Each structure stands twice: as C-alpha cells, then as structure tokens.
C-alpha cells in the first residue's frame, strides 16, 4: 500500500528504510478524518512494564477474556491543506540556544477538519524564503505545504488536552505527523477511499458474533467444529490481530467454563442443545 520511498519524513526529504535490525512492522490503518477523530482511547501498560500508557483503538471491547479491538498506532489519512504554519517555540529570555520549531497544519477531507502537529520539526529549514520576526528577532520558516493541495499523511493519534493543569479534560483527537507526500495523481485518493471502506467494514465486524455464527452452523447438524476450521472461516473477515489462535482459545474457553454455552470434545466445540 505504501512504502518508505513514497513518503517524506519530518525533514521533508524522502526516507528509505536502511535499518537491518529486525523489528515488528506496525500496520497503517486507512481512515477518514471523522473516524480518526473518533478513535476510542483506553489506558493500558507498556510491554514488560508496569508503566501505564494510553492506547488508541478503532474498535474496542473492555472484556479481558478476549478483547475485541484493533489498536491504531499509525493511520493513513488523505486530505487537502486548509492552513499551515511553522512557528518558533518561545525561548527563555537571554538564551543563546538555537530556537526549536513546531508545525501546525489543518487539513480537511469532507468529513471533518483535523489538526496535525509536529514538535521540533525540521520542515522549512531550507524553505523558499526566511525572514526575522520584528517582535522577537526569531528566524521564521515558511511551510512547505500548499493550501488547497491534497496530501497523503501517515499520522499517530494523540489526545489534545485543554491545558497542562486540566489533563483530565480531553478535547479532540489530533495527529502527530510521521510522514507525508503530495498527491499528484488523484487515483490515489480513490485508492485510499476504497481501502478505508474495506478496512472499516472489517473492523466493525464483531469478533464474538462471527465465532458464534460459525459454531452454531455446525452445531445444528451435530458436528463439533475444530479451532482450525473456525480460523479458516474467519481469516477473510477478521484482522490478523483478532484471528489468532490464542485469542480464539481464550474466548472459546470462556464460553465453555464461564458462560457454559459450549461443550468441548476431542473433535472441537459445539453449542449445547439448549443454546442452539
């Protein structure tokens, strides 16, 4: 769908992945601005740590037996630029350090308006024109983004807060810029929309509903269904994170031992007669 060669990083240059160290790829979920702004946030814990972090989900279920969610770490959003500005961060009086800059970018796509930010950005460092702010004497940078032009963005979701002293009062979801490129072929907008519709349909599908539906179809014919068969039915409609052996086993055991609506045999799982 996208590669490192297709997007520009924070310095505005095309980036190529030259890292030879093995790492786990993070999925980039296509979505429109309305969906991005309505992501659900749920607290969780960092891997192998007791430190609590914020996790962002597109579709979430709070049950711990078999969570029904897709975690969104990065998203693919397409939109046109409404306004953009690179501003110098306020420096302490008398400081001789080089100023740092941040990007403020507002984009739209017809479903909503999204604020994109990038702290300590290097964008605009080699801009078309520079001048000094008459008030503070700070070098100003021009944004490389063109207004009313379509761009493709890879973003990380983040909750925008009203003020540091009011951290419990969350406002809207905003995006941290990971990479971008200017869209010159509008077929890319159509591709993004198509991928988003397919992803949205898959993510809205209820994990438990499909498991129940598959097992019940076999149970009414007095056939126990194995784990492999259940997975084969789910593979085309569930995300990779949802269609895993461990998640299925956890939930099936929950239905057997806690809910007591399934029976388990050497051949697989069946609904008990009263539940068929």
UniProtKB/Swiss-Prot annotation:
Matches recorded under InterPro entries: NA-bd_OB-fold (IPR012340)
Start and end residues of each stretch annotated as Disordered: 1-20
Lineage top rank: taxon: Eukaryota
Protein name: Putative uncharacterized protein DDB_G0287991
């Amino acid at each position: 769908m996208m590669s490192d060669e297709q997007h520009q990083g924070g310095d505005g240059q095309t980036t190529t992945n030259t890292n030879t160290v093995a790492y786990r790829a993070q999925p980039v979920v296509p979505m429109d601005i309305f969906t991005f702004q309505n992501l659900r946030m749920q607290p969780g814990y960092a891997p192998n740590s007791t430190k609590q972090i914020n996790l962002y989900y597109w579709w979430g279920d709070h049950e711990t037996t078999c969570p029904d969610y897709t975690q969104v770490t990065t998203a693919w959003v397409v939109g046109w630029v409404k306004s953009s500005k690179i501003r110098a961060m306020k420096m302490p009086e008398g400081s001789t350090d080089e100023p740092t800059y941040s990007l403020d970018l507002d984009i739209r796509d017809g479903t909503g308006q999204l604020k994109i930010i990038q702290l300590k950005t290097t964008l605009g460092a080699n801009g078309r024109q520079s001048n000094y702010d008459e008030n503070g004497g700070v070098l100003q940078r021009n944004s490389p983004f063109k207004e009313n032009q379509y761009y493709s963005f890879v973003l990380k979701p983040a909750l925008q807060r009203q003020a540091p002293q009011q951290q419990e009062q969350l406002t809207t979801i905003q995006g941290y810029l990971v990479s971008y490129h200017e869209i010159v072929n509008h077929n890319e907008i159509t591709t993004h929309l198509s991928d988003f519709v397919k992803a949205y349909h898959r993510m809205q599908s209820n994990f438990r509903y499909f498991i129940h539906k598959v097992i019940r179809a076999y149970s009414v014919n007095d056939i126990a269904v194995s784990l492999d068969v259940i997975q084969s039915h789910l593979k085309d409609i569930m995300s990779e994170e949802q269609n895993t052996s461990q998640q299925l086993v956890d939930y099936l055991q929950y239905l057997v031992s806690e809910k007591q609506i399934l029976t388990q045999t050497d051949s697989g799982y069946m609904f008990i007669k009263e539940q068929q």
